[in-house]
């Protein structure tokens, strides 16, 4: 089989994967799920309070991914403003154009929260959206 292996095997990546799996195992799946749920609930509460922001997809029990649009501004413009404040979001159709057509939107911003995010990250996003909203008002 050696003749089919080009280059150096991904040894460092394998070690990194082992360390990541150990970290997740140490934290425990239940603790991770509880943390992500708490951050997602907090994000839903805070984002829902922003005037002129429309959340796309609000199914009960959804995870920590939030697609949204801000009235009067294109998603790419919102993403650019957020980037200036060090906030990373994705903007566009997210390879889901038929779904966006169903919701009647051309593009969205999408923010994701996971194990490594906290409520302070949600607050930073909300503050950035408010700044962008005022800029485009």
What would you call each of these model-derived segments?
Residues 1-137:
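Pyridoxal 5′-phosphate
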């Amino acid at each position: 089989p050696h003749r089919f292996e080009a280059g150096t095997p991904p040894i460092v990546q394998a070690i990194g994967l082992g360390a990541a799996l150990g970290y997740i195992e140490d934290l425990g799946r239940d603790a991770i799920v509880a943390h992500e749920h708490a951050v997602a609930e907090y994000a839903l509460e805070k984002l829902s309070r922003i005037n002129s922001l429309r959340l796309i997809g609000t199914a009960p029990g959804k995870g920590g991914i939030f697609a949204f649009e801000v009235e009067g501004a294109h998603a790419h413009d919102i993403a650019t403003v957020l980037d200036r404040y060090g906030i990373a979001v994705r903007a566009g159709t997210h390879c889901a154009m038929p779904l966006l057509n169903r919701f009647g939107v051309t593009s969205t911003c999408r923010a994701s929260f996971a194990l490594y995010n906290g409520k302070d990250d949600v607050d930073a996003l909300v503050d950035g959206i408010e700044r962008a909203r005022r800029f485009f008002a």
